């Protein structure tokens, strides 16, 4: 578990069997998603989304997103991380090549709740932060 290691609990990232850790995490996320999709709320008429993002990159790149060069002081992104969006009423199999970062996800959530004063870098449209709208499209 990230951040919970100590004298008697090994740091997962330093463990010898990383493949087993990946399998354990994958199985856990699979069970969690299945349990959420089994709820009445998920099966209802309201629009729901599950967002899965993994932000523990290998740290081998400072390459950011949103037209910011890697060595620029304004680079607030870094690395390539996967994000999966599962919606209950949206189209399936959508991929989006737009580069996003954590602020884009925050911006998307704020927009969904009608919050127009965005927090921190989520407001940085001039630096390329855009909502992830294509991944949350809802079919009529």
What is the meaning of each model-derived region?
Residues 1-140:
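N-terminal pro-sequences and low-complexity stem/linker regions of secreted or lumenal proteins
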């Amino acid at each position: 578990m990230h951040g919970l290691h100590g004298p008697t609990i090994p740091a997962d990232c330093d463990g010898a069997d990383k493949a087993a850790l990946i399998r354990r995490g994958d199985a856990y996320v699979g069970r969690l998603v299945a349990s959420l999709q089994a709820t009445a709320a998920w099966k209802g008429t309201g629009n729901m989304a599950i967002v899965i993002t993994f932000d523990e990159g290998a740290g081998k790149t400072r390459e950011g997103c949103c037209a910011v060069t890697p060595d620029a002081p304004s680079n607030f992104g870094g690395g390539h991380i996967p994000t999966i969006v599962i919606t209950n009423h949206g189209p399936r199999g959508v991929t989006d090549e737009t580069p996003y970062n954590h602020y884009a996800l925050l911006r998307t959530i704020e927009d969904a709740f009608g919050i127009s004063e965005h927090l921190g870098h989520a407001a940085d449209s001039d630096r390329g932060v855009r909502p992830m709208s294509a991944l949350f499209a809802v079919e009529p």
